[in-house]
């Protein structure tokens, strides 16, 4: 079987690795670097990727950076006189990685395992898979970055039982995953994150500071000058890296712009203390996902054996200190934060080819999935942090008599009401035979594959007709939407519960009216008019309350109707039981008569 390469497709940098024997090895790019900038530029129709593209970013406006942040959206980038989708730009990076991996291996590479942030939604995962396909790669598996890191960390520790926390702060995304390792099984217990938090945000804080200071001194806003801004970005990234090793750095950008008196230069000193002050809010934002993941996993900090740091941004001293303070543990520094994800992806490639044995990877889905049901309620079929691949079915029915079709509205999120969650797709199951409401049986099945990609099926159990959809949304969940879902779910829990209670009550009232009307009709002329009249009276009162919309009145009248309807049902069952008993008695008497009337012949037996 041909080699399966492991690719860490990062926001700012990417890496590729391959399994050699039982060891995962990072493949250096043509410039000898073990990571490649995720940068694409266009010059005279030529596509340039990696270090060369990054070097000319200052002078070449046709340069695309941080494309990963646009994956799963319908946003396009204009360059080279064309419009490109994020998948196409990502595919150019993947092609470059694939090319130098082939040069190293001396053979064609057609398959890859590609990593994504654990908090990537369905659209973003699908977009990543599509990018691989465009690059000529068969994507064997999409693996969550923290999970891949854990795989690389734990490969030589398969005989140990450990619970580890992976803290993954990359260039554009942040994930926290809790895993349990033991006997070769890598079991993800929970994952949380922030899809809009990473090294780029730390760089931006420095850029904003430099722009503000320069404006104070010279009255010129550098953020309006595209070329100056690119130089500031490069300087900010360098300063950030410098401050991981020293306590002060000098930022020097000669001829950054020109004023009325001639050229202007930017000369500024930045201390680590000032950098920490500028980025304090970003460091604070890393704490909530850590607590969320621990809570979802049902673990306390004392139960965590190791904390693994992943991603170049975990080299920032303030981040390391925050991790120590939050977990009470010294982070494990046995893995290279820039390379460990690609190495883990290559190990997963080895698991697929059979070169790595006795390793099982159990990943999870980051957000709950379900459909919209009556009253706009979000009915979850698969909860967040469910191990994948997984499949879940639930039977629903029609909401009206003779309903010919049902709309299946597929959603992802954590809020109780459908309108507050993210639509993944819609489809329709048609040609449902005419029947009273509640009679047709519509089975809805959700499947999440090993890559976290969703497909949904609706089947009419009566006719066996079914419709199927693989979710391929063009506008994936934005980072704000994911963050909003989790934060809103907590902030609005009380209001959500009230709204859901209202809808549930209205649905219950509707169902009770329907069921009681049916019972009253079925018992007409059967001799218990007192109970029927009482039920009818309670039914009329509930309908009046329903019309008024007063929830307390509806609740009281619903209880009264349930009591009267139950009394009517008891009479029905008593009558049915009496009729059945009478029928059985008649059958018994008939059998006895038949036995008594049988002719009996006495005979004499003679032995000869």
Curated annotation (Swiss-Prot):
The keyword Nucleotide-binding is assigned to this record: yes
Acidic residues biased stretches: 599-608
Family the UniProt entry places it in: Belongs to the heat shock protein 70 family.
Residue positions, PTM Phosphothreonine: 173
Organism of this sequence: Streptococcus pyogenes serotype M49 (strain NZ131)
Pfam annotation, one family: HSP70
Entry's induction text: By stress conditions e.g. heat shock.
InterPro entries assigned: ATPase_NBD, Chaperone_DnaK, Heat_shock_70_CS, HSP70_C_sf, HSP70_peptide-bd_sf, Hsp_70_fam
Gene3D superfamilies linked: 1.20.1270.10, 3.30.420.40, Actin, Chain A, domain 4, Substrate Binding Domain Of DNAk, Chain A, domain 1
Keyword Phosphoprotein: yes
Comp. bias (Low complexity): 578-598
Top-rank lineage group of the source organism: Bacteria
Full protein name: Chaperone protein DnaK
GO molecular function, one term: ATP binding
Region annotated Disordered, chain positions: 578-608
Gene name as annotated: dnaK
Keywords: ATP-binding, Chaperone, Nucleotide-binding, Phosphoprotein, Stress response
Functional note: Acts as a chaperone.
């Amino acid at each position: 079987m041909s080699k399966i390469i492991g690719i860490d497709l990062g926001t700012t940098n990417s890496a590729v690795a391959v399994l050699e024997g039982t060891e995962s090895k990072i493949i250096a790019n043509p410039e000898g670097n073990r990571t490649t900038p995720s940068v694409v530029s266009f010059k005279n129709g030529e596509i340039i990727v990696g270090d060369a593209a990054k070097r000319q970013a200052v002078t070449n406006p046709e340069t695309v950076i941080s494309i990963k942040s646009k994956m799963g959206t319908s946003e396009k980038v204009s360059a080279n006189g064309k419009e490109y989708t994020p998948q196409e730009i990502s595919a150019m990076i993947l092609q470059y990685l694939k090319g130098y991996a082939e040069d190293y291996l001396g053979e064609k590479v057609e398959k890859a395992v590609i990593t994504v942030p654990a908090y990537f939604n369905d659209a973003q995962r699908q977009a990543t898979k599509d990018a691989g396909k465009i690059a000529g790669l068969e994507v064997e598996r999409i693996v969550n970055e923290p999970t891949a890191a854990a795989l690389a960390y734990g490969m030589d520790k398969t005989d140990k039982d450990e619970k580890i926390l992976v803290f993954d702060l990359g260039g554009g995304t942040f994930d926290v995953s809790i895993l349990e390792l033991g006997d070769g099984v890598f079991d993800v217990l929970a994952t949380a994150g922030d899809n809009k938090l990473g090294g780029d945000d730390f760089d931006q804080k420095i850029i904003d500071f430099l722009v503000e200071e320069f404006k104070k001194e010279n009255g010129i806003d550098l953020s309006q000058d595209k070329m100056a801004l690119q130089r500031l970005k490069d300087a900010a990234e360098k300063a950030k890296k410098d401050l991981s090793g020293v306590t002060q750095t000098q930022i020097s950008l000669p001829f950054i712009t020109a004023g009325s008196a001639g050229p202007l230069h930017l000369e500024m000193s930045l201390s680590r203390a000032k950098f920490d002050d500028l980025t304090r809010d970003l460091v604070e934002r890393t704490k909530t996902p850590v607590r969320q993941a621990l809570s979802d996993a049902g673990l306390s900090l004392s139960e965590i054996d190791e904390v693994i740091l992943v991603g170049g941004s975990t080299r920032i001293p303030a981040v390391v200190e925050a991790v120590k303070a939050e977990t009470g543990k010294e982070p494990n520094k046995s893995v290279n934060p820039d390379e460990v994800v690609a190495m883990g992806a290559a190990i997963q490639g080895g698991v697929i080819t059979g070169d790595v044995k006795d390793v099982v990877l159990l990943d999870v889905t980051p957000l709950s999935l379900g459909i919209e049901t009556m009253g706009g309620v979000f009915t979850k079929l698969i909860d967040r942090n469910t191990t994948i691949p997984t499949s879940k079915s639930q039977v629903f029915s029609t909401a009206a008599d003779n309903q010919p079709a049902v709309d299946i509205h597929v959603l992802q999120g954590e809020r109780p009401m459908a309108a507050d969650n993210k639509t993944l797709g819609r489809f329709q199951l048609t040609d449902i035979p005419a029947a009273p409401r509640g009679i047709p049986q519509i089975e809805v099945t959700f499947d999440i594959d090993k890559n976290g990609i969703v497909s949904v099926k609706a089947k009419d159990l009566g006719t066996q007709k079914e419709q199927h959809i693989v979710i391929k949304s063009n506008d994936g969940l934005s980072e704000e939407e994911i963050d909003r879902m989790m934060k809103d779910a907590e902030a609005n829990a009380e209001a959500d519960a009230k709204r859901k209670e209202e809808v549930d009550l209205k649905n219950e009232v509707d169902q009770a009216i329907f069921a009681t009307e049916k019972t009253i009709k079925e018992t007409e002329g059967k001799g218990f008019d007192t109970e029927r009249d009482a039920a009818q009276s309670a039914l009329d009162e509930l309908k009046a309350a329903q019309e008024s919309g007063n929830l307390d009145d509806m609740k009281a009248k619903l209880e009264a109707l349930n009591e009267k309807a139950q009394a009517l049902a008891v009479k029905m069952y008593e009558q049915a039981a009496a009729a059945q008993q009478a029928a059985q008695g008649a059958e018994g008497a008939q059998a006895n008569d038949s036995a008594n009337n049988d002719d009996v012949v006495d005979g004499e037996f003679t032995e000869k």
